[in-house]
């Protein structure tokens, strides 16, 4: 071989014999391999870019668990852009034509990204395990900052393990033993070293992750059984028999979905708010100029809570609002409410008649701009509409009362007194937490299964080649190695299949609907109607 790696030729009796590119494959083979690998690479890139964009644009996805998935997507994106395409070129040409430096850089990037994927899966497995088995102690420490530290350590360990050895081994031993037309890790030329790295990089992590997942599954099933027993005992209480509406109220307090655009357009209102102390002094609140309201009263942003599908056959309950106070940050979500926390609000209802007799009120801020120094503190409130004696000001605004969900509604002729059973509330809360844990465990199981299926063939061939060097055909080596890359293609599909939020966000991004959705929501929540 010539010393200059950029001259693609060998010499026979001093005469250069140039290699013909793609000489080892027929034309149809080249076209087929190139087309298939190009499609897989494109799907990998698009899928993992969608994961990153989804994490950026959808705040619902910014959870601690999804930080680990974001890190995994970064590793998969590197593999989709660089590893897949360079390895395909290497296969089609039958030789490495980019030189030793490019070879070492590619191998370092490839092995660091692949090992980072394994490390991220380990971190996700331990995170799920501790979240299930130590919910009180571990979850208090489970913060985005801590997740960032763990992700950084996963990448740092992967870099330290592979990059220095791949790039510097030839200098440590004093020479490069890898032929110029080949690209492989020099220190893995010994079968025993290859065997050891396969054990450390694949078999041990897979064994640990499998054990952790089995324990996660067993603990989740145990908690599901305990919760079912608790729900069974709770459902036979007399309070539940007499007041079936309790379940609907508690569910409404926990869920506050945003209305659809059509509902928003039908139910836009303008409003102003004042403290209850103003009305108790005998002076009814009046709708005033928005600037005056902003100076004298805390502004509210609300969304109406509609009953879920499982509540449709139950008696209608009072609407529940999620209220965001624009305040100086003195309040906190954990504060206890008293009767003084009730709000009396003038709303100008522009609702249409629906099947239910209870009107739906959508309240918008009086002004689009708020002082930057103010903070948002979220509370959940119940909207109580008085049927008799409802006051109306000269602008046609009706007075309604907003009560905290935790504050019982006074028994008035026009309202239903709802006082949820505390034990039932606890059961509901436990069920919601358990549902989230089960979804996270399902995502982990899908990712882990995909990892085992795609990585096992290659690592089995590594073990076989240790004892029988010529037993594995070159074609199988290529397929096994490429199958490891396919894991990066499958991971985003697993996220979409197991996580509804990912799936919906992917769909909106692919259909270019996300920007339109954001604009509509911004217009709605800022309020597109002004006070008269």
Curated annotation (Swiss-Prot):
Stretches in topological domain Cytoplasmic: 54-66, 127-146, 215-443, 499-532
What keywords is this UniProt entry annotated with? Answer: Cell membrane, Disulfide bond, G-protein coupled receptor, Glycoprotein, Membrane, Phosphoprotein, Postsynaptic cell membrane, Receptor, Synapse, Transducer, Transmembrane, Transmembrane helix
Chain positions covered by the region annotation Disordered: 262-365
From which domain of life does this come? Answer: Eukaryota
Sample GO molecular function, one term = G protein-coupled acetylcholine receptor activity
**SUPFAM superfamilies, per database record:** Family A G protein-coupled receptor-like (SSF81321)
- The intrachain disulfides are 103-183
Extracellular-side positions? 1-29, 88-104, 170-191, 465-478
Name its GO BP terms in alphabetical order. adenylate cyclase-inhibiting G protein-coupled acetylcholine receptor signaling pathway; chemical synaptic transmission; dopamine transport; G protein-coupled receptor signaling pathway, coupled to cyclic nucleotide second messenger; gastric acid secretion; transmission of nerve impulse
Subcellular compartments: Cell membrane; Postsynaptic cell membrane
Pfam families named among the record's database cross-references? 7tm_1
Name-wise, this protein is Muscarinic acetylcholine receptor M5
Question: In which organism is this protein found?
Answer: Macaca mulatta (Rhesus macaque)
């Amino acid at each position: 071989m010539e010393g200059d790696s950029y001259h693609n030729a060998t010499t026979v009796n001093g005469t250069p014999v140039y290699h013909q590119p793609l000489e080892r494959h027929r034309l149809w083979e080249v076209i087929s391999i190139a087309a298939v690998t190009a499609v897989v690479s494109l799907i990998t890139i698009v899928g993992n870019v969608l994961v990153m964009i989804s994490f950026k644009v959808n705040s619902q996805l910014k959870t601690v668990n999804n930080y680990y998935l974001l890190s995994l997507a970064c590793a998969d994106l590197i593999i989709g852009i660089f590893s897949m395409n360079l390895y395909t070129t290497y296969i089609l040409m039958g030789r490495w034509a980019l030189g030793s430096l490019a070879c070492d850089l590619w191998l370092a990037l490839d092995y660091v990204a692949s090992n980072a994927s394994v490390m991220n899966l380990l971190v996700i497995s331990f995170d799920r395990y501790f979240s299930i088995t130590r919910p009180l102690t571990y979850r208090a420490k489970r913060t985005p900052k801590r997740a960032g530290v763990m992700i950084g350590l996963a990448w740092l360990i992967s870099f330290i393990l592979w990059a220095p050895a791949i790039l510097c081994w030839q200098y440590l031993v004093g020479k490069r033993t890898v032929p110029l037309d080949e690209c492989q890790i020099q220190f893995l030329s010994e079968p025993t070293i290859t065997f050891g790295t396969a054990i450390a990089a694949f078999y041990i992590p897979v064994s640990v992750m499998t054990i952790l997942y089995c324990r996660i599954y067993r603990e989740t099933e145990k908690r599901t059984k305990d919760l079912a027993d608790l729900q069974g005992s709770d459902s036979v209480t007399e309070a539940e028999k007499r007041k079936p509406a309790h379940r609907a109220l508690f569910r409404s307090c926990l869920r506050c979905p945003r209305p659809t655009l059509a509902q928003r357009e039908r139910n836009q209102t303008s409003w102003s708010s004042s403290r209850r102390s103003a009305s108790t002094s005998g002076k009814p609140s009046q709708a005033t100029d928005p600037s005056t309201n902003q100076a004298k009263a805390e502004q509210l942003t609300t969304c109406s809570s509609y009953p879920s599908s499982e509540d449709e056959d139950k008696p209608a309950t009072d609407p529940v609002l999620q209220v965001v106070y624009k305040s100086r940050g003195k309040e906190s979500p954990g504060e206890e409410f008293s009767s003084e926390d009730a709000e009396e609000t003038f709303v100008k209802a522009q609702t249409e008649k629906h099947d239910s007799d209870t009107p739906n009120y959508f309240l918008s801020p009086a002004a689009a701009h708020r002082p930057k120094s103010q903070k948002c503190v979220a509370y959940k409130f119940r909207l109580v509409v008085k049927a008799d004696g409802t006051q109306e000001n000269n602008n046609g605004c009706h007075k309604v009362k907003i009560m905290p969900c935790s504050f019982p509604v006074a028994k008035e002729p026009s309202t239903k007194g709802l006082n949820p059973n505390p034990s039932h509330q606890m059961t509901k809360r436990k069920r919601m937490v358990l549902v989230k844990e089960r979804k996270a465990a399902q995502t982990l199981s899908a990712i882990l299964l995909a990892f085992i299926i795609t990585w096992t063939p290659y690592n089995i061939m590594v073990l076989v080649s240790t004892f029988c060097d010529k037993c594995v055909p070159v074609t199988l080596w290529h397929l096994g190695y490429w199958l490891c890359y396919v894991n990066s293609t499958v991971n985003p599909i697993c996220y979409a299949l197991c996580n509804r939020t990912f799936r919906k966000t992917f769909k909106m991004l692919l259909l270019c609907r996300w920007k339109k959705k954001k604009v509509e929501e911004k217009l709605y929540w800022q309020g597109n109607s002004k006070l008269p």
